[in-house]
Amino acid sequence: MNGRKVDYLTLNGKDFFKGNNRIMLDNLSYYTVDKLQFFNQRSERSQLMGKDVERPDFIMNVKLKQEYSIGYLGNVEVGAGTHERWMGRGFALRFTDNSRISLFGNANNVNESRHPGGDGKWGQSDSPEGDTDTYSVGGELLVDDKRERYKEVFNASLLWNKSHDEQHTTSQQFIQQGDIFGYSSGVTAKQGFKFNIKNKFTLKRVGLISDTRLDYFDYDNDAVMRSVQFSEQPNEDWTQVLDSIFSTSQSNKMLDIMVNNVQDASYNSGRRWTAEQKFDYHKSLPWGDDLMLTARCLWNGAKNDGNSHYWLRYANGDMPDDVQERLSRSKSHSYDLHFGVEYAIHFLTGWHLIFDIAHNQQNADERNNLYRLDWDENFRQGEMLQSLTDYLHLRDANNSPDIDNTKHEEYVTASLHKHDSDSRRGRYFSFTTALNARYVSQDGIYTRGENTARPSDHRWLLRPSVDIEYQTRQWHETYKLHYDTEMRPLNLAQMVDLIDTSNPLAIQKGNPDLRPSIVHNLSFLFSSRFGTHGQFALLRSSATVMNSLVAVNSIYDKNTGVSTFMPVNVNGNWAYNSSIDLHRALTKDRNLNIESHTSYNYQHSADIKDNAKSTVKQHIVEQNLKLEYKRKQFALSLLSGISWNGMRLIGVDDINNVNFNYGANLQADLPFKLHLSTDIRMYSRRGYADRSLCTNNLLWNAQINSTFLNGRLLVAAKAFDLLHQISSTHTTFNSQARIETWRLSLPSYFMLSVQYKFNRNPKRK
């Protein structure tokens, strides 16, 4: 709203899918709305305490016409398209002034998993990577007592999905003896089921809040992978490289520079679950102070069964092939208990002094078993024994870790707050400074075969912070400043002085001499609305300095392609980010507008490679422009963007990747009550090491629709990727490697869909 971000929407003053603003706008019919209201509202915590102790929320309230304040509404849509694409979804809502019950369902094979209450709007192919079938159902129940005694919110969802994906990767590892070039290709097939329940119950007058959550997920995954490493970069692209290496007629030229190649076919199935219960109690004391009690219990469990056929071949003739038939079984359980007491002292001057004492206790145990079926000379591929007891003599004990971890944390926090809000003048000021001190006590038992390690860490960790926010001139200007220093606890798993050789090409070691990392964060934000042409400016800037950051030292054996990894501390890591967003109307009627986004990111990354420190300097510059014209039911946008990603590393040729795009969006009413929506954009990539990724892809999507029955019936024809040009490519840089990845994209299709919206409102007596 005029440059201010709406925190969430309400319907007739009540929550409506809080935090998911689009759902109301997408499902309410325009003729039911009386007016839109914008205002500041006390946060939920401030309402319970009866005073302003937090920044107020900025609310957009949709006020319905009197005759529509009670009733039903919903919509259903079905569609069928080319290339066997299909979709179906529905949404229904029953609401009154103080209650709401909603149901939704979604089924499609166009990579759409959103639902009302997700990020809002029912959308089309928002995730083009991979090929996924999705089936989901769910609902929400809300009851807000009109006498302000209690509030109940319950929601549940179930999701089934099945996906197919392909991925191709080219990489360049920066090695002192000479870079290593890798090529890999993988195909995965996944299917899974998710179940989620959330319940929030509030006794407003008592000040008690109960939050309950239950998550369950089970999965079945199949994967086939091929990879190869070279001591020199081949001239061919990845398809020619892999086809040559894994064919019967191999290229002698490629064999001369090959280090190793791997084929791996694997299957995994398992399940995970989480149960959480949390209680918050707020009590306003007679003398004006507040007491807050918190209790939380969290339980987690997981089980995974897997097997794989692994074949590693070395180019070095002195090294025999490593063929492994692996069977894995793992289980884990953990719990997390938290108890806290908070006491707030409120001064007449508007300052708040808060003391917080808390205890946190965690315990986790894992049981992992790896069986090497190839150790049995009588084993035949595809043959499985009936019981795990038949495999006990084949257990790879050194790669079957048993883990028991216990962590105790004692928190002491003191914070000083000042909140001052003046709605009449449109001003707001907030100052918060806090010092958090926690004593962390960690003990672990890690067992691999006959070897046992008992890592432990006991220390105080401090985190001071300062936050300042100031809004003025009828909310036209906003200033925000944040600083904190965080001492991060150690990960015991990285301190275990034992060796993991389950992956023959990636040997893992621990480091018992690790030190905690210390991270400094500083950020600043300024926004302003000014002038008579809807001018808006937003400036963001942040810097991060990391001391004793835990990095991974990798030592590469160029003869075999085996890497040995060990975590180490390294200094010299810092980052800076800055961006500016501008908006301005170019005409008095504000029909013609221009928007600009400019950003600069710098990463100074220090790492350890082959026991030597290496530093990468990475610059990312991005510029996006949008020119938009709107008049009545016509909207035309011209868009362009360019980004440069440059990396500098001593001993390595400079890397310069450039991505740029340009195109247009059009929405217009046509004769015969037709409406057209279309977008076309050219995406270009330059500077990639794999020349097959330097492409020009012209993407064109279009939709034409018409409404009938007073807007209740919508018939639409949709076309996704009309020119068959979509492509998905990602690049990753760090001080150890450059990785370029291509992923399968959803194929183009044409779809015809029909949507029907309905509402029913009882007559007022």
Predicted regions: what they are:
Residues 1-17, 45-53:
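Extracytoplasmic beta-strand/coil segments of soluble accessory domains associated
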Residues 4-6, 31-33, 55-59, 71, ...:
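Extracytoplasmic
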Residues 19-22, 42-84, 99-765:
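Primarily recognizes Gram-negative and organellar outer-membrane beta-barrels
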